[in-house]
């Protein structure tokens, strides 16, 4: 079996689509049974795995980790100040400055590409045209990010409840402890098609086509200026989160809740 990225090396490693750090974040310090909850029509259950499979060779896996994964983990889960990123929160949005465009864009591209080629059920709804997958593969292999308007990713900051000025560390951690199966959405009236991931306290909404330069200029997607504006959303205002809550509650009523 050859590496799915470079198509050459055969020392294939276990690769995580959503990096393992995001799953470990929601487990306890002793790495006991997973604390995150999987919600599906089959029922609610505690997750215990971080969904990996053999995809990349050791060299490509290490390149991903070194070039952008470690950076994004620090930005989302730990302390953005450690990588020089500043943030300013208002009631409706968070403005991040001094982000590394190359690293964040490559991470977004790798997320979509790996999820789309995965054989795991967790990612079964991520479907991308072969031509796009090949463009992603080549660019990721060369570690060259797309332009901001190509396969743009809109990042909403997700909280369980609307945050106030005195947000506690516990509330902050809780806001980053949700991981959802990615979902593909097609809106024919609006002419858009996108895949949504939720993990690390963000909704990552990746369009499967180009976007208007308006979104780039307004800092709605990551761009070379390093400024990104993330709207603040919560369960009540987020369709995917609200839908998962309805399914979870329905499972409980049917006797398919957590055992």
For the regions a language model picked out, list residue spans one by one.
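An N-terminal structural lobe/cap that precedes and organizes the functional/catalytic core
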Residues: 1-71
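Short alpha-helix boundary/capping motifs
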Residues: 31, 84-86, 136
């Amino acid at each position: 079996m050859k590496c799915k990225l470079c198509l050459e090396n055969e020392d294939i490693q276990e690769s995580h689509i959503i990096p393992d750090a995001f799953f470990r974040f929601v487990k306890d310090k002793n790495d006991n049974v997973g604390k995150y909850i999987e919600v599906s029509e089959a029922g609610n259950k505690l997750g215990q795995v971080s969904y990996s499979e053999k995809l990349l060779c050791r060299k490509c896996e290490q390149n991903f980790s070194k070039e952008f994964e470690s950076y994004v983990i620090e930005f989302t889960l730990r302390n953005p100040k450690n990588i020089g990123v500043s943030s300013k929160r208002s009631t409706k949005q968070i403005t991040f400055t001094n982000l590394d465009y190359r690293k964040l864009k490559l991470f977004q591209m790798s997320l979509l590409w790996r999820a789309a080629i995965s054989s795991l059920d967790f990612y079964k709804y991520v479907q991308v045209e072969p031509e796009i997958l090949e463009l992603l593969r080549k660019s990721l292999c060369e570690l060259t990010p797309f332009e901001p308007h190509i396969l743009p990713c809109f990042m909403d900051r997700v909280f369980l409840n609307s945050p106030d000025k005195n947000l506690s560390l516990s509330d902050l951690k809780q806001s980053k402890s949700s991981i959802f199966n990615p979902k593909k959405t097609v809106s024919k009236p609006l002419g858009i098609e996108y895949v949504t991931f939720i993990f690390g306290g963000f909704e990552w909404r990746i369009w499967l086509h180009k976007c208007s330069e308006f979104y780039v200029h307004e800092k709605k997607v990551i761009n070379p200026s390093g400024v990104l504006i993330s709207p603040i959303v919560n369960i009540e205002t987020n369709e995917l989160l609200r839908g998962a809550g309805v399914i979870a509650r329905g499972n409980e009523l049917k006797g398919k809740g957590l055992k």
